[in-house]
């Protein structure tokens, strides 16, 4: 009993004499090596055959290496709460997907290696939270798209960006221009075809720019390039020098690259791909005088165009030059035209006015410009009065009033023009439809001598079954036309118009000649031919029947012959078989009996038996004397 009070007295002193216990640490993932004995903590799992990020990671780790594994995705929870992580390597895995916000807790991360994976795009939320990131390695992926806001959180801190060996055709150049602290920018081995002017003008700390092996035909001058000496190789170059690499591009060596040719550079492997005269030559061996451009030349423009108000109009202008000229349009009022609610400008030099107005009439100017100069061409557009209102699916056959010829509707507006109506009645202008059959009809109209300057006639018609208007252009000297390919058993509405040149306005106009309605005859329905399989089956059955009948007849004949020539009862001879007795009297002496003449050979008979009854020869049978 005396021991218990002693233990109670010593119990308060026990914690003071025990050493402090370290904080509990997570177990090291299988096949990984963990450094947890001293700071900084690290988890090293290279080549461990991992299929996903281990869930038992020590969240206090400052370095995590998961390279050379088979990780296919990075989920939101995989790296959660790793606020002290400084270096993360996910190189050479099979990562196809990175969840939005997967790195949101890695606010202290300095380096992120995602090279050698299978990423196809990088969105705005996938790199969110990396506010201290300095090195971002995305090379050797399959990136085809980079979102404009993908680098927003690390734009002010990023120093090294590697996008090489991807499938990038376009880049968010405005976003790249905000990387003010970037030192190295790797864009090599992509599919970039152009770089906008001034794309690198704000990258004041840029020391190396690699654009090797892209599809660049030209490199625009940039203030950054003119401010720093360019050297092909960094060896021996000053610290402030910019290293620019652009070999392996199909450079078009014309006057746009003279600025680059004038810069002092060490030996490099750039070569010209075009024009043909310079193709394959070493870039730095081509003299400056050979970097020439050709001024633009307008090769095609639209002829004077006349359209009624409210209709669309298309103005075209084509030009050639080196480099390819850019075509712009100037309105008759002197305004530079572009895409708007009423007009659309296309890169090929076409200007489309969606709805023309009277004030649009005048001279439009086409301007083709390139680095060597510019060329202009004028296109006249006349906007006439709007056409008279037309009923739906109808074409008026009334003649226009004097001095108001209706403008010829352009083919592009044919669907919006007046159509032949279902209620058109034959007029008194002499348009007749004769000799109409099931699929053809002959149209005749009188001579239009009162209308001068007729260029051609136009026949337009449609059937009662559809609203598609069909046009036929007829020479001016014709007075009839045979319509073919008509549908049988349908009613057609038809109008004939005279196309002529109006002397007052100089425009092409139309005047109705007349309209008519006719019906095609119904087609005779031919007898349906028997189906081929049916014919084949019938022939087989008939042939089989003939064969069976022949066999039956043959068997019947055999049976009949057997019955007629069959075996007779014994003791009777056939009546039809004459037999001469061989027992005859020959002058009372025995001698050889002459045989009867041999009968003519008869048809073979099966199993024919002939029995002859011969009485014994003796004295009692001698014939009586005379």
Curated annotation (Swiss-Prot):
Domain LRRCT: 249-295
Recorded family membership: Belongs to the LRFN family.
LRRNT domain segment(s): 19-59
Known glycosylation sites: 339, 348, 393
Record-linked Gene3D superfamilies: Immunoglobulins, Ribonuclease Inhibitor
Pfam family, one: I-set
Ranges of the Extracellular topological domain: 17-539
Assembly and binders: Can form heteromeric complexes with LRFN1, LRFN2, LRFN4 and LRFN5. Able to form homomeric complexes across cell junctions, between adjacent cells. Does not interact with DLG4.
GO cellular component, one term: postsynaptic density membrane
SUPFAM superfamilies on file: Fibronectin type III, Immunoglobulin, L domain-like
Mod. after translation: N-glycosylated.
Fibronectin type-III domain location: 308-395, 425-523
Topology with respect to the bilayer: Single-pass type I membrane protein
Disulfide bonds: 317-366
Start and end residues of each Ig-like domain: 295-382
Record localization: Cell membrane; Cell projection, Axon; Cell projection, Dendrite; Synapse
Annotated function: Cell adhesion molecule that mediates homophilic cell-cell adhesion in a Ca(2+)-independent manner. Promotes neurite outgrowth in hippocampal neurons.
Keyword flag Ribonucleoprotein: no
Biological process, per Gene Ontology: regulation of presynapse assembly; regulation of synaptic membrane adhesion; synaptic membrane adhesion
InterPro entries: Cys-rich_flank_reg_C, FN3_dom, FN3_sf, Ig-like_dom, Ig-like_dom_sf, Ig-like_fold, Ig_I-set, Ig_sub
UniProt feature, compositional bias: Low complexity: 406-423
Membrane topology (Cytoplasmic): 561-626
Each LRR repeat, start to end: 84-105, 108-129, 132-153, 157-178, 181-202, 205-226
Tissue expression remark: Expressed in brain. Within brain, expressed in hippocampus, cerebellum, olfactory bulb and forebrain (at protein level).
Protein's name in the database: Leucine-rich repeat and fibronectin type-III domain-containing protein 3
Name of encoding gene: Lrfn3
UniProt source species: Rattus norvegicus
Region (Disordered) residue spans: 382-423
């Amino acid at each position: 009993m005396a021991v218990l009070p002693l233990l109670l007295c010593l119990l308060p002193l026990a914690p003071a004499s025990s050493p402090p216990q370290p904080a509990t640490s997570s177990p090291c993932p299988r096949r990984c090596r963990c450094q947890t004995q001293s700071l900084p903590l690290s988890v090293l799992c290279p080549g461990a055959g991992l299929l996903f990020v281990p869930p038992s990671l020590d969240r206090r780790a400052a370095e995590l290496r998961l390279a050379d594994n088979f990780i296919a995705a990075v989920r939101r929870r995989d790296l959660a709460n790793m606020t002290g992580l400084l270096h993360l390597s996910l190189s050479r895995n099979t990562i196809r997907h990175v969840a939005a916000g997967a790195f949101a807790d890695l606010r202290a991360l300095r380096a992120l290696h995602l090279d050698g994976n299978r990423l196809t795009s990088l969105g705005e939320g996938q790199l969110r939270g990396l506010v201290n990131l300095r090195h971002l390695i995305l090379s050797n992926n399959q990136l085809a798209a980079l979102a404009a806001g993908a680098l927003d959180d690390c734009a002010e801190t990023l120093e090294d960006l590697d996008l090489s060996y991807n499938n990038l055709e376009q880049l968010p150049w405005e976003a790249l221009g905000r990387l003010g602290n970037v030192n190295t920018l790797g864009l090599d081995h992509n599919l970039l075809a152009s770089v906008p002017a001034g794309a690198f003008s704000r990258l004041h700390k840029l020391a190396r720019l690699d654009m090797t092996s892209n599809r660049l035909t030209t490199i625009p001058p940039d203030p950054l390039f003119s401010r720093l000496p360019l050297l092909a190789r960094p060896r021996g170059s000053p610290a402030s020098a910019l290293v620019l690499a652009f070999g392996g591009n199909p450079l078009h060596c014309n006057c746009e690259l003279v600025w680059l040719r004038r810069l002092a550079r060490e030996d490099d492997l750039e070569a010209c791909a075009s024009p043909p005269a310079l193709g394959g030559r070493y870039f730095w061996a081509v003299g400056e005088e050979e970097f020439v451009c050709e001024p633009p030349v307008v090769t095609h423009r639209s002829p004077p165009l006349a359209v009624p108000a409210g209709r669309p109009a298309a103005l075209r202008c084509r030009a050639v030059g080196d480099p390819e000229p850019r075509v712009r349009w100037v309105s008759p009022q002197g305004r530079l035209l572009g895409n708007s609610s009423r007009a659309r400008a296309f890169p090929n030099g076409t200007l489309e006015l969606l709805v023309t107005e009277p004030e649009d009439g005048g001279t439009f100017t086409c301007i083709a410009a390139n680095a060597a100069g510019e060329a202009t061409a004028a296109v006249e557009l006349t906007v006439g009065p709007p056409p008279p209102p037309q009923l739906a699916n109808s074409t008026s056959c009334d003649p226009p009033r004097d001095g108001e010829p209706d403008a010829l509707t352009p083919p592009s507006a044919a669907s919006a023009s007046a159509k032949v109506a279902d209620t058109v009645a034959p007029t008194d202008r002499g348009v007749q439809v004769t000799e109409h059959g099931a699929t053809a009809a002959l149209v005749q109209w009188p001579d239009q001598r009162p209308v001068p300057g007729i260029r051609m006639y136009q026949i337009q018609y449609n059937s009662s079954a559809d609203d598609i208007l069909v046009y036929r252009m007829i020479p001016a000297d014709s007075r009839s036309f045979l319509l073919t390919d008509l549908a049988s058993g349908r009613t057609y509405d038809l109008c004939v118009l005279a196309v002529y040149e109006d002397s007052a306005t100089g425009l092409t106009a139309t005047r109705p000649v007349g309209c008519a309605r006719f019906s095609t005859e119904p087609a005779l329905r031919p007898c349906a031919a028997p189906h081929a399989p049916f014919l084949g089956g019938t022939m087989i059955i008939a042939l089989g029947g003939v064969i069976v009948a022949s066999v039956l007849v043959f068997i019947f004949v055999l049976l009949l012959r057997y019955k007629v020539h069959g075996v007779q009862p014994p003791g009777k001879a056939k009546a039809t078989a004459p037999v001469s007795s061989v027992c005859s009297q020959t002058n009372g002496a025995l001698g050889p009996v002459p045989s009867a003449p041999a009968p003519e050979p008869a048809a073979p008979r099966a199993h024919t038996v002939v029995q002859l009854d011969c009485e014994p020869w003796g004295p009692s049978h001698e014939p009586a004397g005379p």
